[in-house]
Swiss-Prot record:
Cofactor binding remark: Binds 1 potassium ion per subunit.
Keywords linked to the UniProt accession: Cytoplasm, GTP-binding, Hydrolase, Magnesium, Metal-binding, Nucleotide-binding, Potassium, tRNA processing
Known role: Exhibits a very high intrinsic GTPase hydrolysis rate. Involved in the addition of a carboxymethylaminomethyl (cmnm) group at the wobble position (U34) of certain tRNAs, forming tRNA-cmnm(5)s(2)U34.
Entry protein name: tRNA modification GTPase MnmE
Cofactor annotation: K(+)
Residue sites binding Mg(2+) per the record: 235, 256
Gene that produces this protein: mnmE
Residues reported to bind (6S)-5-formyl-5,6,7,8-tetrahydrofolate: 28, 86, 125, 453
Sequence similarity: Belongs to the TRAFAC class TrmE-Era-EngA-EngB-Septin-like GTPase superfamily. TrmE GTPase family.
Length: 453
C-alpha cells in the first residue's frame, strides 16, 4: 500500500543535483524532523521561518564541514507538503558525502527514487499526471515533449480528462435510472439522446490517444531506413547525415552486411534514427543474403524509407525488387538520386524526387524534406487536445476508449452490459486522474524517478 504510505513519518534526504564535482550541490531534506536534524549539524539556531534563506556552517563536533545556504520551507507550503530544507553546499563529492553522512547519523533516511514527488502526491500537492510531468520535463528531448510536460504540470490535461470522466459518470446515473425504472419512456428518450454525446467523447479520446502515441513515437525517434542496391552510396549518405565516419565506405559491392545505425536531431526537436542497410540485390552469397533479408525487415519497421539510387545506373535500376516491395507494403518512401555530380545535368530522371551528392555532402534538399515529412507525422490539428507521454497513461486511456467502442458498436445491448462498460471506462479515467488508487501502479510510476526528485 504505497510502500505502507512510505513510512509516512520518516525524514528523508537525497542529493538533488548530479553526483559530480561542480560549483554547487543541493541536498534535499524533508519530513517532520527536518528542522530538528538540521539544528544538530549547524553552528547556529536554524529558525522555522518559511521562504527564508539562512547562512550557516555545517559542523561535525568542532570540525567545520562547509559554509552553506539553507532554503527553508514550512509545512504545508513546500513541494512535499512537509517541513523541508534545501542545503546549498559547495560541489565537492567529499563535502556532500560528509553532509549526508551527518544527516543519516542524526536520524534522516536516504530517500528512495521519486520519494519526494511521491510524498507531494500523497499530501495532495500534485496529482499523478503532474508527478509524471515532472519526470517527463526532466527527460524532454524536444519542444513538443517539453510543451506537453509544461501543460501537464499546470494541471491543464487533468482538467480535460476530468470533464470526460464526469460526462461518463453522468451517463452511468442515467443508465441506472433506466434499469431501475424501465416503465418511464421519457428516461429512455433522454438516454438515447445522451448516447449521442458518447460519440463526441469517443472522438475526443481517440484524438488524445492518437496524438499521445505520435508524440511518444517522435520522442523515441522516427525510424528512417536507407535502402538501395549495392554501391548506391547508402553508407556515404549515413555518414554525411551524421557528419561522422560511422559506416564503412568502399567501392566493393556488398560491403555493408548488417544494419548500421545513428541518430540526428533536426530543428532541436525531431529525433531521427537512421538505419543504413545492406545493399539489396540477387545474391548467391549466403552471408550477404542474411544481410539482405535483414534489410527487408528493417523496411517493415521503419516510419519512412529513403530509397537511394545511383544516378549513373538510373536508366537500368530494378523496379521489380525494392520498389515493388515498398509499394506492396504501403511504406512511405522517397526516391533519392545520388552522385548527381557524376551525371549529365540534362539526364532525364523523372521519378527521382531529390538529387544529392552524399560524397560531397550536398544533401541540404534531403534534410529539408526529412524535416517537413517528420513534422507531418505529428499532425498539429486540434492543438488544444491533451497529450500524455507515459505508457501507463496511454494504456488507461485506450482501455476507456475500448469500452466506449463496445457500447457504440452495439447500441441495442442490455443496459446491464452498458453499465459494465461505462464503469470500466470511468475507472480507467479515475486512475489517470489518481482518484481511483492503484497502489501497485503508483509504486511503479515513482520507482522510475530520479533520486532527489
Amino acid at each position: 500500500m504505497i510502500n505502507k504510505i512510505m513510512k509516512k513519518y520518516e525524514t528523508i534526504y537525497a542529493l538533488a543535483t548530479a553526483p559530480y564535482n561542480s560549483a554547487i550541490h543541493v541536498i534535499r531534506l524533508s519530513g517532520p524532523d527536518a528542522f530538528e536534524i538540521i539544528n544538530k549539524i549547524c553552528d547556529k539556531q536554524i529558525t522555522k521561518e518559511g521562504y527564508r534563506i539562512q547562512n550557516a556552517r555545517i559542523v561535525d563536533n568542532d570540525q567545520i564541514i562547509d559554509d552553506v545556504l539553507l532554503m527553508k520551507f514550512v509545512a504545508p507550503k513546500s513541494f512535499t507538503g512537509e517541513d523541508s530544507i534545501e542545503i546549498n553546499c559547495h560541489g565537492g563529492l567529499f563535502v556532500i558525502n560528509k553532509i549526508m553522512a551527518l544527516l543519516n547519523k542524526h536520524g534522516a533516511h536516504l530517500a528512495r527514487r521519486g520519494e519526494f514527488s511521491k510524498r507531494s502526491y500523497i499530501n495532495k500537492k500534485i496529482d499523478l499526471n503532474q508527478a509524471t510531468a515532472i519526470h517527463d520535463l526532466i527527460f524532454a528531448k524536444n519542444n513538443l515533449s517539453h510543451s506537453a510536460s509544461i501543460k501537464a504540470l499546470s494541471g491543464e490535461f487533468s482538467k480535460d480528462i476530468k470533464n470526460i470522466q464526469q460526462e461518463i459518470f453522468r451517463l452511468i446515473g442515467l443508465v441506472e435510472i433506466a434499469i431501475d425504472y424501465p416503465e418511464y419512456e421519457d428516461e429512455k428518450k433522454e438516454l438515447t439522446e445522451e448516447f449521442k454525446n458518447l460519440t463526441n467523447i469517443r472522438q475526443k479520446l481517440q484524438r488524445i490517444v492518437n496524438k499521445s502515441l505520435k508524440l511518444k513515437q517522435i520522442s523515441e525517434g522516427i525510424k528512417i531506413a536507407i535502402v538501395g542496391e549495392p554501391n548506391a552510396g547508402k553508407s556515404s549518405l549515413l555518414n554525411a547525415l551524421l557528419n561522422e565516419q560511422k559506416a564503412i565506405v568502399t567501392n566493393i559491392p556488398g560491403t555493408t552486411r548488417d544494419t548500421v545505425e545513428g541518430q540526428i536531431v533536426l530543428n532541436d526537436e525531431l529525433i531521427i534514427n537512421l538505419i543504413d542497410t545492406a545493399g539489396i540485390r540477387k545474391s548467391s552469397d549466403q552471408i550477404e543474403q542474411i544481410g539482405i533479408n535483414k534489410s527487408f525487415k528493417t523496411i517493415d519497421k521503419s516510419d519512412l524509407v529513403i530509397y537511394l539510387i545511383d544516378l549513373n545506373k538510373y536508366q537500368n535500376y530494378d523496379k521489380t525488387n525494392i520498389y515493388k516491395y515498398l509499394i506492396n507494403k504501403k511504406k512511405q518512401f522517397v526516391l533519392v538520386g545520388n552522385k548527381v555530380d557524376e551525371v549529365d545535368p540534362t539526364l532525364n530522371t523523372g521519378e527521382i524526387q531529390i538529387k544529392i551528392s552524399a560524397k560531397n555532402n550536398d544533401i541540404s534538399d534531403l534534410i529539408k524534406y526529412l524535416e517537413e515529412t517528420s513534422l507531418a507525422i505529428f499532425n498539429d490539428e486540434n492543438k488544444q487536445d491533451s497529450i500524455f507521454q507515459e505508457e501507463w497513461q496511454i494504456n488507461l486511456l485506450q482501455t476507456a476508449l475500448y469500452n466506449i467502442n463496445l457500447i457504440l458498436n452495439d447500441p441495442n445491448q442490455y443496459h446491464d452490459l452498458v453499465i459494465q462498460h461505462l464503469n470500466e471506462a470511468n475507472n480507467s479515467l479515475l486512475k489517470v486522474l489518481s482518484e481511483y488508487e492503484d497502489y501497485n501502479l503508483i509504486d511503479e510510476i515513482f520507482k522510475n524517478f530520479c533520486l532527489g526528485k
